[in-house]
């Protein structure tokens, strides 16, 4: 079927009904008007047994093309193209024979002239025709082909004739009486028959039904093996675990590998008597909300449609339209009742709510894989690709590693030679400190492990202590990797668009957490932590790092100084770490010796990995580099590995900051007389960084490395750095805005690009949730909006202090739109009353709330050192802070200035609170009731 939907969002029910009742195999849609890759439309299609591949416009509304096809058909490739005059999507569907049909769905923009389109279309067809056979070109061409004497139509027909193509539609397809929707093919290659044009639908374009003589290749039903845990007698199971643990403990293990084998056997033997595996066929089924009443109404609707097609009687048409509307309303009623009952039956749990939301918005984590005939072959391809990718990067380095214990004589601090053994109570705290997420390779699923933790604790304690005392992790070093598509709109056929994700065994995570606690304690005692490295550290986050960076930028701008920032981009940084270099740092710089060093050496060495697809594992391959995927201690080790880079940049006069593999370096300068020196310094510094990274087997990507200069508005015309050229000929462009840890920073610190992007994304979420709000109660809708939209809206909003009134107004309007979404109000209705009912703070108050919360954390040792040192207590008795003097509004926006000002304006009873939760509660209540009076107090504390 071909159809110009003119917004599929509000016509999807009718399209789905047409697909199901007409037993259609595929639909080709133009003007979908989709705004995002995933929404409730794509979710509804998938729920009804169809897949969709579509192209949407990012920069403006309207347009969009899509191919919809049954789940069990194999769409071999799908690519979208956008030209100046039209957009299209290409899809290739194979038959059971070698025949392959290549569909191209086209939508021409009517804003541009037909002559421009014909020129582009000829070039497109010429390039496509050479490489593809069995072409079917269809879509809305916005050409009146029924007016055969017009010059544009004559030229269009000549183009088709040149390539042996025929246009098959000879009836009007638009309410205006013109033929706009076309079906084009080579009759000698592809036979199209039984073309029917149906004008009863909800668009100004007709349905075009047709048949193609081709037996499509269908996927076989998937057979999966599942285990059922529902009927376990937990008391009996726990008693069985206790008896097996007693046998385990009586063996007095001295070898970690033997103990691990016995533990796995213990768990497997305990489970096998209670859990049974069975194989089931995964077949298509109708949505769960479809009951017999709805099925009868839909069947009646179909009968009325067939009667009207047969008679073309006006009374039959009216009866069909009435039945169609009744079916539509009943489907909404049934879905609403089903989803609301599901949430209520789950005792209003947020987990059930978000599961339904993900399902309705097509946000569920479904596996997308390249087309394949054998999962094992594909798994081996992925494993080879992931290994060889790192091997190729490593081969680009021509460096001889230094001896393993190089630097031994230079370390004079305390050493750590052995781990302290843990008690069962201590281990239980470590286990419960994080959510229990098990791997499919674990001998016990997560919920059983949690329920039986007390019974398993003696065996777990023995295993953990054996690992710590012997320095062994043997048996826990095989990684099982799942390939995950990096971006939803990436080409799923290319292996480079996938990232390896490993879900580590839970026992390994537990041992690593125990090691991490003691290793961090040692580094705290020896003051070995890098203060400005914020990744994977308590009280540190992207927002704390950005607060520090923007504080320094604002302070420099306040003193009429510019700041140049270099944001590095590394290729596969975690995966190219050299084990010998890392072990050398652990030994010579941090003082890890004896059994502790042996544990790290054993943990890193002898690792293997395999890829799993649909339960089929590839062959294991040796993994000689990198910190282990999915490990708890891997990020900690990476921070250690790059610690010298931070020191190197500080020695060069830069302020260095890092978050995992994202590193940035800032340098302040006077534009009047230091600009030339800085322009020469940055390339040499990047060369120095490149040499250091080459030395440590890290690959710097100059083309993606970002450089930006933050400058006062008055100095904008004085800056003309242009491109920076490195010694190897690489060029680094100086940008006006950069993407830094999730926030777009612009050169004059207006945050306008970031706010625009955030609001655009937010309105997309509002649009999606609007499509499903009819299925969810208001209370549940509040939870969704707060968790999905407002949480993202508040992300890094502490940086918004001092933004322009225009930007503040945009944020306020967006917040109002969120409130209207919950209460179903239109855009012209006031929202003051519902904002109070929702207990939402105004946008400015939300920013102040976040900043004051960080000040509280700084004063109570709950923040990074680099933030805490910006806050100075002035008077201890009333807990007031020193407010530094500033010269411009830039200085007023710095955290070191605005933080104390906001703090000093609070009532003393709030400032003296010691509990963070209590402080936030009192602060929100105060802001909610007295924010206007609070703002009036701010002017009293401009400077100290």
Regions found by a protein language model. Give the residues of each.
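Short phosphate/oxyanion-binding micro-motifs
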Residues: 1-132, 145-150, 154-165, 176, ...
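Short, conserved micro-motifs composed of acidic
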Residues: 42-45, 151, 172-196, 417, ...
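Conserved pre-catalytic core of RNA-dependent polymerases
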Residues: 85, 386, 417-628, 667, ...
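Arg/Lys-enriched, amphipathic patches
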Residues: 101-106, 112, 134-148, 211, ...
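Active-site palm subdomain of RNA-directed nucleic acid polymerases
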Residues: 124-138, 515-533, 558, 563, ...
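Catalytic palm subdomain of template-directed nucleic-acid polymerases
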Residues: 143-154, 572-590, 664-690, 802
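Surface-exposed loop/turn segments and immediately adjacent short secondary-structure elements
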Residues: 211, 215-217, 240, 251, ...
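Basic, alpha-helical interaction scaffolds
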Residues: 232-269, 729-799
